[in-house]
A protein has these predicted regions:
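Carbohydrate-binding surfaces of carbohydrate-active enzymes
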Residues: 1-196
Length: 196
């Protein structure tokens, strides 16, 4: 999807190509992880009618390890290589991952969950996933990164605008505000409620 396409408020996404999917993503504690320490709560594969057999197999592996994947079964392989044998391998891989799971719903696959036939919004609601950031201004710009010791949120006013108000973050602990212009750091005035 386009970076500017409508997306559920309070959530962000990164793009992932087949190389990252195949070689760089692992699953730990139900989260998809990169070697750099980035974590993701969900792998979303929208409207993908064709896939490589290796991609289907990797999705199955991530599911069995505990990932949450939002994807419907692909219809055909993304390559003609392998001829009829390649087609057969593709069909078998799809059967191992999706099997009879074609109706909209949540399905257990190994330790993971497969959300089939759902929009991203429907999958978020079905899994009761809470937004990372809540703000009265839907145009507020933000980015979240987590390290071993802290959650980091970079927050900026909407383009060509200003922001004044409360923002809720899905994390707990002591909060500091850092001014990127002058380097000033101060203790933020925070309250904690409902996981925020």
């Amino acid at each position: 999807p386009s970076q500017h396409a409508p997306f559920p408020l309070g959530f962000r996404y990164d793009y992932c190509n087949t190389d990252i999917l195949t070689h760089r993503l692992t699953v730990s504690g139900g989260l998809l992880c990169t070697p750099e320490g980035l974590t993701y709560r969900m792998l979303w594969i929208p409207h993908n009618q064709r896939m490589l057999t290796s991609t289907v197999e990797r999705i199955g592996s991530l599911l069995r390890q505990g990932a949450l994947v939002v994807a419907s079964a692909p219809c055909s392989p993304a390559t003609l290589m392998g001829g009829k044998q390649g087609e057969k391998a593709f069909r078998q891989a799809v059967e191992r991952v999706w099997g009879k799971r074609h109706k909209p719903g949540l399905y257990r696959v190994g330790k993971g969950t497969l959300a089939v036939g759902m929009s991203i919004q429907e999958a978020l609601e079905a899994t009761r996933m809470q937004p990372d950031v809540q703000s009265p201004d839907s145009n507020l710009q933000w980015l979240h990164r987590r390290t071993q010791d802290a959650d980091w949120y970079f927050v900026a006013a909407p383009p060509q605008g200003t922001f004044r108000g409360q923002v809720r973050f899905r994390c707990q602990g002591i909060a500091e505000e850092w001014n990127p212009v002058n380097g000033r750091i101060w203790q933020a005035d925070v309250t904690q409620a409902d996981g925020y």
